[in-house]
Each structure stands twice: as C-alpha cells, then as structure tokens.
Amino acid sequence: MKIPLFFDGYDLKAYDFPGGRPLSHLRERLRYHYRLMKGAQPSTGFYVAFRNLAKSLEMLGHEICINDFGFARRNPDYPVGFSGYLAPLARFGLQNPILYGPGRVPDPDHLAALRQRMNLATVTYPSQWPIMLNPVGSRDLFAPMFVGIDTDAWPDLSSQTKTVDILLYNKVRWEAPTRDVDLMAPLRALFKARGLTVEEIHYGHHTPEQFRASLGRSRTMVFCTEHETQGLACQEAMSSGLPIFAWDEGKLSDPSQQRIAPGPVTPSSVPYFDDRCGLRFTTQNMEERFDQFWNQRHGFHPRDYVVENLSLLRGGQRFMELYGALCDRAGIPTDPSRPVTSASV
C-alpha cells in the first residue's frame, strides 16, 4: 500500500510549495556532506531513525512517499506518518489521522495544544518508559514503537582482527564534571588496572564510518549515558556483535523531564536488552560487574537479540500494527503492493 510519511527536522525540511521536495532533498545532501567534511555526525538520530523506518516499510512491500502534501490533502481520511519535530508540521493544517514517531515528543502542555490543531491519533515513543512522563489520563494516546536496526549496514564484525579490548562510548549529557569523577575516571582506572586496551569516543564527534571502524577493531563496548529512549548507537554495536557493558542507574537525569514527570519514572540506558547482550552496572558495583562481564564476554550473543527483536523487518511490522489500526478505522486495506527483499532496498 501507499504510505505517506512526513519529516521535518535539521536534516530534511517539509516544504509545502512547488519544487519543495527536491529543494529539501538538495539541502539535506549539502548539509550531510558539509558535516561529514567537518568530521561531525552527519545525520541526526531522528533522521537515521526515519530513514530506517522508510526502508523497513519498503522491505515489507509498501510504497513510501515523503512530504507529499498534495496526496495528503486529496485524501484527508488517509492516515499519515509524521516524524521529526511535530510543531513545524502542525502549521500545514493537514486533517489526516496522524501516527507520530520517531521524533521529539513535545511536553504534555505543548502536546495538548498541538492536538487542537492536528488529528493526532497515536503518538509513539521508542520504548515504554518515556510514556510515564505524561499524565495518567492521557496515556492511552501513546504507544511504544522502536525503529529497526539495519543489520546489513551493521554486520557481524566479531570475526575481524581485534586490537582494542574496550570501546568506551561516552554519551554523558548532564553534570559531566561529576560523572567524570564518579563514573568515567573510575572506569578508565579499572581498565588500566586490568591491563586492557581502551579506545574512547564521544557522542556526536564521529562519523558512521569512524564508528563502524572502531567497532571492527574492538572486542566489547562500554556504553555510558544516563538514559535512552532507544539507543541506536548501542544497538548498532550489538548488531556488530560487540557485548555491551551498560551503565544503567535507573534514575531520571534530564532536568526538563524531571519537571514534567507526574510521578516516579524509572528510565533505562538500554531499554532493549537481555542476557544475550551483556551486563548492566551502576557506579556502586562497576568493578564487580565488570569482572563478571569480562570473564563471560565470549558467552554473549548480542547480534542474535537484535536480529530477533530489533531488525528492520521487526521495526516495519511494529509500525504497521499501529498504522494498520488507523487504516482499519478509515476502511483502507493495508496489503503490501509487492514483495521486496532486503537486498533490493
């Protein structure tokens, strides 16, 4: 079936005027290559997630059209998918039922105002825990929807020659000086005491190619961030076959989220994770847990978890569960137009 998707963000802009779509695509390409030349992360996480969503739906045999305002206006009862930043998309006045995500879900008060201007049927978060940031009475609007990981683009690298024991992925976002004292410095000292080689990278300061090369030469990854709604970089490492040692305190650190949370919220840095993937730790038990992790490192199989639960196919199927419910209400069939293999996408 034809699935209209809309995206507005730093990468791709939703332009509602003649020639807007090719202009937006040109702008996206220029931005991508400029950031690549600067050595910065060329695409935002939202845009990577959006591209993966589109690819997963094409794999299921659906036809994707992006930022096609003409189609949406000609078919006002036809459900559409919105991704990226929601507020800019509200200005276009589309009446279609909307499945929102992946993207930056506005705070509850702002979202309530946007619902007066848009037909928001379902709003998604990448995992379950962020839904708890919203008032209890509004939670029926929300659903978890992860974005699939491209396991072909992030292949199993476990058989490559390894020269680095630990890839230390630093995505600390709040109270960095404090976290350097109670988290990062103790980890570095622990690895040094164990005689392990370490490569440290910082979120936002590497390209996908640099990250992939780091994964290829590393035996394991230590993932340090306060909490994630999905955690694409961690899951890309898991897809590449690296066991994960994940810092996971279960505490809400984002001040903006602390202000809006109606009650206790228990976040996670690895919301999609099981015993095949690696181990979690806190600042209080890092040494004990790391020794356990290192001794068991050959017994973890993180790629199996990703292929089973987080592949592009699984991501597309989850989208269609939610999108199909909107189509059922509108009497629109959801059969794919053609079978497609992953190799042809």
Predicted regions located by residue number:
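Short alpha-helical donor nucleotide-sugar binding micro-motif in glycosyltransferases
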Residues: 214-218
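N-terminal pre-catalytic "stem/leader" segment of glycosyltransferase-like enzymes
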Residues: 1-85, 313, 317-322, 330-338, ...
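Donor nucleotide-sugar binding/catalytic pocket of nucleotide-sugar-dependent glycosyltransferases
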Residues: 121-132, 138-154
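A short hydrophobic beta-strand element within the catalytic core of glycosyltransferases
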Residues: 221-222
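Catalytic binding pocket for nucleotide-activated donors in carbohydrate/polymer assembly enzymes
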Residues: 230-309
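Conserved catalytic-core segment of nucleotide-activated headgroup transferases in glycan assembly
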Residues: 40, 136, 147-208
